[in-house]
Amino acid sequence: MDDMAENAGISARKLLFLPYLMGERTPHLDPNARGAFIGLSAIHERGDMIRAIMEGVSYSLADCLSVLDEMGVRPEKMLACGGGGTSALWRQMLADIYGMSVSTVDSKEAPALGVAILAMVGAGIYSTVQEACEKILRLKTTTAPIAENSEKYAKVYAIYKALYPHLKNDFGALAEL
């Protein structure tokens, strides 16, 4: 699937996906929000739809990151694991959209390792999460953002961000049917 999505290129030939399949919680807090393809036409193929879904989920996560930005917290790097973390294309997409490096951890059970790290901090084995991560985590791959891609994604993300406010009332009306 990565090959098909990669061939579609950034913006999936002008196709956007809103990933609100079960409403939206952050930052919109709207249980009526629904998923949608915007810009779908007869020219689009499976790869375009896959790419649009990947980008839509990435933009949704960028919305979550914007909440941290508003609180004055800006991560400098990201760790990816599991499903999307195994995709080199998705890691590059995340790095480009967020403007930060995305690394994978050399662990097949990274989520469980994260829980173990939190437990060790809670038990006093390490004094901070940062200290525990520095001692325990081993990075496997690191993907740096590509400035040219970041510029392209920023233009698409601006359109993505404008869609929810335009559709909010329609989502509500649809829920009332």
Where do the language-model regions lie?
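Glycine/Thr-rich phosphate-binding loops that ligate phosphate moieties of nucleotide
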Residues: 1-177
